Regions:
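Alpha-helical metal-binding/catalytic segments enriched in His/Glu/Asp
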Residues: 82-86
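Extended beta-strand/beta-hairpin segments
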Residues: 1-79, 92-191
Length: 191
């Protein structure tokens, strides 16, 4: 963090966008429903190219796990997304709490065990623990910052999706035909 005391948020713009969004949602409640989409394609080994809107992303694994290290791992993108989401919500709601944000940083860490996918006894591969360490520099009172962070955390779809079970559906097409998946038994029972 630097010593330069500059509010990184356009407070007036933030208040205007908030008011406009509330007005739109009040008059058209269905406009609050949103779908986001990412499309990914395996290039070679663990190297994957993804597209999210107009943006191109690359993902890979470390050499020790069969990759060529041409990009962050999928889970690194996942936790970076969680950090981006929380900071976006803090920036979005800072004007409502009169919290100038001179500097904000989120350090997100996720702990998990890979044993299960390699046929070893262990947890199911889900994150065991996720920690958001948020560092804020602001001239606002501590109570204002606390309220802002609590609001941002509740408004962060990534944090809420990590907290609550979310139904996941996987659809597979093999050579143009649907291929039903049957989830039975241990992960590696067929290897």
């Amino acid at each position: 963090m630097t010593d330069e005391p500059t509010n990184r948020i356009n407070m007036e713009k933030g208040r205007q966008v908030y008011a406009q969004t509330r007005a739109r949602l009040a008059s058209h409640p269905a406009s609050g429903k949103t779908t986001i989409r990412a499309v990914a394609k395996l290039l070679e080994d663990m190297h994957i190219e993804g597209r999210v809107g107009k943006f191109r992303l690359e993902s890979d694994e470390p050499a020790v796990r069969g990759g060529t290290e041409l990009g962050p791992t999928p889970l690194q993108y996942f936790i970076a997304g969680a950090a981006f989401c929380l900071l976006t919500q803090m920036a979005r709601f800072a004007p409502l709490y009169d919290v100038p944000l001179e500097e904000v940083q989120a350090d997100v860490r996720a702990e998990f065990d890979i044993s299960d996918k390699f046929g070893m006894a262990g947890p199911d591969g889900a994150f065991e623990h996720v920690t958001y360490a948020v560092t804020v520099r602001s001239s606002a009172r501590p109570e204002q910052v606390r309220l802002l962070v609590e609001h941002a955390e509740r408004a962060c779809h990534a944090a809420q999706s990590l907290r609550q079970p979310v139904p996941v559906q996987v659809e597979v097409h093999l050579n143009g035909q649907p291929l039903p998946l049957i989830h039975k038994g241990p992960l590696n029972q067929h290897l």
